[in-house]
A protein has these predicted regions:
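Extended hydrophobic alpha-helices typical of membrane-associated regions
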Residues: 145-196
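Alpha-helical membrane-inserting segments
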Residues: 18-19, 66-73, 96, 139, ...
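Multi-pass membrane catalytic core of lipid/isoprenoid biosynthesis enzymes
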Residues: 1-23, 114-147, 186-195
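Transmembrane alpha-helical segments that form the membrane-embedded catalytic/substrate-channel core
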Residues: 35-45, 64, 68-69, 87-102, ...
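Structural signature of hydrophobic alpha-helical transmembrane segments
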Residues: 23-34, 86-88, 151-156
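Intramembrane alpha-helical segments
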Residues: 1-80
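Acidic (Asp/Glu-rich) catalytic motifs at the cytosolic membrane interface
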Residues: 95-117
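Small-residue-rich segments of transmembrane alpha-helices in multi-pass membrane proteins
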Residues: 56-71, 89, 118-122, 182-196
Length: 196
């Protein structure tokens, strides 16, 4: 596994270095932080994913870094729209982590992994999933302020499959059957990406 991580990180660094042709040296800092937190996520004396930081890291490194970073490399600036779009994407991707942690909550508790669901309980996990999707949709309404009517209103359609998936998750409650919720959540994320 360590070899796979090393190969992946090396390839990511090589690809990331090509972005330096389009943007400045500050990308080196962002890239170094990405590599550092990739290792700190599950290794070291204080593995972040084992101590309830997984959700925060997902929002940062799957929301702000890729969405904002991509925009920055192309435009060499950062706008409030980019901040909101980055946060929306981070929240959506975190729904996938929440389903995973919800499914694994009992095993995580036994192994000492203190995810937010282990810390705050199964009921919290259910509503956390629902809240992430609703928050992402409602944040899209910000785009009305900028005159982007479709970017504000179309994503509200995401709420339908999100709530339906949440209801199924609550009914299934535990076990391997929750794997189907991972698939539905991924589908819902793709749907939101198309709508946005």
């Amino acid at each position: 596994m360590k070899t796979g991580i090393a190969v992946t990180v090396t390839l990511a660094c090589l690809i990331g270095c090509t972005l330096l042709l389009f943007a400045g040296w500050e990308l080196i800092i962002i890239g170094a932080l990405c590599v550092l937190f990739a290792f700190l996520y599950t290794t070291g004396p204080y593995p972040l994913s084992y101590n309830g930081w997984g959700d925060v890291l997902v929002i940062i490194f799957f929301g702000f870094v890729p969405v904002g970073g991509t925009y920055y490399v192309q435009a060499l600036t950062w706008t409030p729209d980019v901040t909101i779009a980055s946060f929306i994407c981070g929240l959506l991707i975190d729904t996938l982590l929440v389903v995973n942690n919800y499914r694994d909550r009992e095993a995580d508790a036994r192994s000492g992994k203190r995810t937010v669901i282990v810390r705050f309980g199964e009921k919290f996990g259910r509503y956390f999933y629902l809240l992430l999707g609703i928050s992402a949709s409602l944040l899209c309404l910000y785009f009305l302020r900028e005159g982007h009517i479709y970017a504000a209103l179309l994503p509200q359609l995401y709420l339908v499959p999100h709530v339906l998936t949440w209801r199924r998750m609550v009914k299934i409650h535990s076990g391997k059957k929750l794997n189907s919720i991972l698939g539905e959540t991924s589908r819902n994320m793709l749907f939101m990406g198309i709508l946005l």
